[in-house]
């Protein structure tokens, strides 16, 4: 049996949290920030739990998570 490869791009973006859940960061927080409100930027900087539909696909990309 050969080793399964990890998708490195996915490994950098997602982290495992307890009980088979995946944490991720929100998008749209890297540039063009001057037109976005402070409240919006604060909400975008939060870490959230990935949706259950995406979690299945993420676990396929990260076999050793």
Curated annotation (Swiss-Prot):
Q: Name one GO biological process term.
A: translation
Q: Which SUPFAM superfamilies match?
A: L35p-like
Checking Pfam families in the record gives: Ribosomal_L35p (PF01632)
- Which keywords annotate this record? Cyanelle, Plastid, Ribonucleoprotein, Ribosomal protein
The protein's matches in Gene3D superfamilies, at most eight in alphabetical order, are given as: 4.10.410.60
The reply on keyword Ribonucleoprotein is yes
Query: What HAMAP family does UniProt report for this protein, alphabetically?
Result: Ribosomal_bL35
Q: Which PANTHER family match?
A: 54S RIBOSOMAL PROTEIN BL35M (PTHR33343), LARGE RIBOSOMAL SUBUNIT PROTEIN BL35M (PTHR33343:SF1)
Q: What is the name of this protein?
A: Large ribosomal subunit protein bL35c
Q: Which gene encodes it?
A: rpl35
